[in-house]
Structure formats: structure tokens, C-alpha cells
Amino acid sequence: MSARTLDGKATAAAIKAELRERVSALRERGVVPGLGTILVGDDPGSQWYVAGKHRDCAEVGIASLRRDLPAEISQAELEAVVEQLNADPGCTGFIVQLPLPSHLDTDAVLELVDPAKDADGLHPTNLGRLVLNVNRPITTPLPCTPRGVIELMLRHGIDLAGKDVVVVGRGVTVGRSIGALLTRREVNATVTLTHTGTKSLDEHLRSADVIVAAAGVPGLVSAENVKPGAIVLDVGVSRVEDPETGKSRVAGDVAADVAGVASWISPNPGGVGPMTRALLLQNVVESAERALR
């Protein structure tokens, strides 16, 4: 068996095309969605991620509001910038790029973000609303990566109803939030949340119809612990040394041999990553649409 590819790049491009039409419709009504970013310091990786988000905005017609701040900024000064974006009608969603310098209280900064403008969908208020909402239509921003994982499968014709999904990883970005989306009645999957401390992790993996690997452990999921025909999504991000070049490279949680066992697999990079970026834009557009209702 050779796994088919869950192509995140092509799927994200399709979502962006849809968003361009929605942004155009909003502009006709006098509303221009705007994504704000707050970047503290000059970390090259963070600068690269933020620049990518603004390139995405340009592709679909979303306005960019970039706030690049010095690494030595005080807590009060940073919180004032957050409040400015909260109050700016041209900003329909924004993110605070993490990590922040160690002298800053990250939780306090993130909780200050207006939940209606929470482009990442990870504000405590929005996560709480998601947990409480099993049936009703979603009216708050959703976590981008979990939503991207599900959308990637749905747009490849995969029906998740009744599927046993094993999630590996307990971080807020994916592990703790994806179960709330997968178990909504409109999706109707059954979810087991595991992590690197789970006993008999191999047994859980071998029983799964779908595996979402988000532990940040290179090669954690291999062919020997995936049942034939399973669907495998690689969300893990780690840095390892390339033995041939000696340089650092990004590695996922899923070993290459899984492609010979699974029915579908998401590449890493090129799978869930582009979906996360596309769904961030969708949160910004949806916030603008909700403001008009």
C-alpha cells in the first residue's frame, strides 16, 4: 500500500481563493478585514513567521497592521499596544507572536486580547465556549491548527463520523483543543488523547482509524504502530541535525515508513502548516463578517 497525500498546499490555496471572494464582498459593504501582528524582539524565526502571515494577507486582500516592538519593552507598554489593536476598528483579528521575552507575562498579555479579535482561536474565553458548544453553530474564532487538520481531511472526502481518532500531544495549540472540535455532532468522531507519558501508546496507535501526531518527538509514529489503512496527520515540529549536511532541519513526528502502511498521510512540511495559515485568515474574515450581523 502506498498512502495518498493530504495536500495542504493545494487545499490552503483553495481556501484562500474562497476567502478572496468573501473579502471582496465585505469591501463592497465598506468593510476591509485587517490582521494585526505583535512581534517583540528580533528573533529570525518569529520574523519569518510574521512576514509569511502578512504575505498571506496580501494574497486575499486583507489589510496588514504590523507592530514590531523592541525586546526590552515593558509589560505595561506591550499591554498598551494590545489595547490599541483591541480598539482599532480596522483590525478584525490579531495575534501576539510567541515566544515573548522571559521578562514578560505571556498569559496576562494573551488574556488581554479581545476574544472577538483572537485570530489564533486560543483565547481562554473562546476555548471555553468551544468546549460548551456541542450542537450550536460556531460564533467564535476557532483554533487554527485543529480546524486545519479537520478541514484537510474533509476536503479530501474523508468522513470522520464514527472514526476512532488518537491524538498524540497535550499542548493547547493542538492536543487539548482538537478533541472539542472532533467530538462536535457535525463531525462525530471518537477521540483518545494520548501523550509521551501514556502507557501502551503503541496499542492506542495500532487501534486508531486516524492518528494526529502533535507531540514534537521526531519519528514517534512509525509503520510498526500504525494499522494498515489508517489516516495519519503529522503536526509535530522539531529541529534535528541533518546527518549529511550537519545543518539543522525541521522534522515531524511521523517516520517515512508510515507512507507504506497508511491510506492517507499529510506531508511535513506541506500538510497541516499551510492549512493553519489559511485558517488564521479565515478567522480574521469571519470576525469581520460577524461584526456586520
From Swiss-Prot:
EC id: 1.5.1.5, 3.5.4.9
Known pathway: One-carbon metabolism; tetrahydrofolate interconversion
A cellular component annotation (GO) from this entry: cytosol
Residues annotated for NADP(+) binding in this entry: G169, R170, G171, T196, V237
Keywords, ordered alphabetically: Amino-acid biosynthesis, Histidine biosynthesis, Hydrolase, Methionine biosynthesis, Multifunctional enzyme, NADP, One-carbon metabolism, Oxidoreductase, Purine biosynthesis
InterPro entries tied to this protein: Aminoacid_DH-like_N_sf (IPR046346), NAD(P)-bd_dom_sf (IPR036291), THF_DH/CycHdrlase (IPR000672), THF_DH/CycHdrlase_cat_dom (IPR020630), THF_DH/CycHdrlase_NAD-bd_dom (IPR020631)
Alphabetical list of HAMAP family matching this protein: THF_DHG_CYH
Subunit-level organization: Homodimer.
Matching NCBIfam families: PRK14193.1
Role this protein plays: Catalyzes the oxidation of 5,10-methylenetetrahydrofolate to 5,10-methenyltetrahydrofolate and then the hydrolysis of 5,10-methenyltetrahydrofolate to 10-formyltetrahydrofolate.
Protein name (record): Bifunctional protein FolD
